[in-house]
Curated annotation (Swiss-Prot):
Gene: Cyt-b5-r
Pfam family, one: Cyt-b5
Domain Cytochrome b5 heme-binding, residue spans: 16-100
Binding site for heme: H59, H82
Keywords: Heme, Iron, Metal-binding
MF terms (GO), sorted A to Z: heme binding; metal ion binding
GO CC, one annotated term: mitochondrion
Name of protein: Cytochrome b5-related protein
Family: Belongs to the cytochrome b5 family.
Known role: May play a role in muscle cell metabolism.
Length: 142
């Protein structure tokens, strides 16, 4: 990608650090992301900086992902992987401070498309018959 054309994506307010370095690797991408989001070596979700250090070993999804994302903005991943509102309430105790404005232009307003869709999915899941899953789980255990 050429720096002059990066704004066409409209996702970020600045060109990603190390993105023009060849080759772009997972490690260079993560390094650039850590530098760009200014999470100060902690985790950023929306407009907050969080210290999940004490939570790493308790994370229900395992320790790998949460360790690897330290120092980055995990907003979109946090939203996509947590359908219930419980995790959002739980992270409040880990908040260190408010953060500067995000470099990403994606929004997750409470009355916006994504949050509305997420709420509708949450409601729909309450009505889904879970018997086929239970039957499948039992047969897997045999």
């Amino acid at each position: 990608m050429v720096i002059e054309t990066w704004k066409k994506s409209g996702i970020a307010t600045k060109f990603p650090t190390y993105r023009n370095s060849a080759p772009v690797t997972v490690h260079s991408w993560q390094k650039g992301k850590r530098q760009d989001v200014e999470a100060e070596g902690l985790w950023r979700i929306k407009d907050g900086i969080y210290d999940f250090t004490e939570f790493i070993d308790k994370h229900p999804g395992g320790t790998f992902w949460i360790r690897e994302t330290k120092g980055t903005d995990i907003t979109e991943a946090f939203e996509a992987h947590h359908l219930t509102t419980a995790p959002e309430k739980m992270i409040a105790k880990y908040k260190v401070r408010d953060a500067y404005q995000r470099i990403y232009t994606l929004t997750l307003h409470e009355d916006g498309f994504y949050k509305t869709l997420k709420e509708r999915v949450r409601e729909k899941l309450k009505t889904i018959d879970k018997r086929p899953k239970r039957k499948s789980d039992v047969s897997d255990d045999l």
